C-alpha cells in the first residue's frame, strides 16, 4: 500500500500492431472513484497489449514501478482511502517445487522519488542506463541500423540460405552503414500438411533444412566477415502441438 494525495497512475498500452502502441495513459486513483486497474499481457509476451512499467505520481513525490518478468505477468492497482494498493507477480502460476529445487520468481523494482513527473522520468532513465541496460565489452549498446530480406513470402517463410547471402552482399555493396542483419519469424520448419509454410507454427526451433541445408552458420559467417551482428527471432514460450519442443 502506498500513501499519497491525489495519486495518478501512469501506464502504457504496450505493442498490439496499432498506431496507438506504446501510448502512455493515466488514471486518477481517488478513493471516491473506487478505481481498480488490472494489467496483464497477451500470450506470454511481456509487452503484448500491456507494459510492465508504471508510475504512481502523488502530490510532491512519486514511485516508478517495474515488474521484472519476461513472460506472463500481472499487476493490479486499486484506490484506497489515502492512497493506492498494488499487487503484482506472475500470472497463472500453479506449481510446487521438490526439496532442493529452486525457481526464479518475478523481480519487482520500486523507485521512490521526491518531485514531479518529469523528475521521476529522469531519475528512472539514469538508473536504467547505469544498472539495467547491457554494456557489451563495458561500452554502451551502439545504435543499430538493421537490414533484412524476407524472400517475398509471409514473414520469412520464403527466406533461404541463398537469398539471404545474396542480399547481405547487396546491402554491403550499397555502402550504407548497416551493422545488423535481421531474420524474423518463419526461418524454422513451419510446413503444414498441405505443404504451405505457416510462420505461427512454432516449436520446431531449428532451421528449415530444405531452405537452410546446413543451418544458419553460413549466414552468421557472412555477417561476421563484414563486421555485422545477427538478429534472429524466436519465441520459445509459444509451442504448437506436434512440434519438436512440444
Positions of predicted regions on the chain:
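Structured loops at beta-to-helix junctions and adjacent beta-edge loops in soluble globular domains
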Residues: 57-59, 68-70, 108-113, 147-150
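A residue-level signal for beta-strand positions that form part of recognition/binding surfaces
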Residues: 62, 102, 143
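Terminal connector regions
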Residues: 109-144
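Aromatic-lined carbohydrate-binding/catalytic grooves of carbohydrate-active enzymes
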Residues: 142-246
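Short Pro-Gly-centered flexible turn/kink motifs
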Residues: 95-114
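Polysaccharide-binding surfaces and accessory modules of carbohydrate-active proteins
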Residues: 1-78, 91
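A short, polar/charged loop/turn motif at coil->beta-strand junctions and beta-hairpin connectors
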Residues: 59, 80, 138-142
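Short acidic, Pro/Gly- and aromatic-enriched capping/linker segments at domain boundaries
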Residues: 79-98
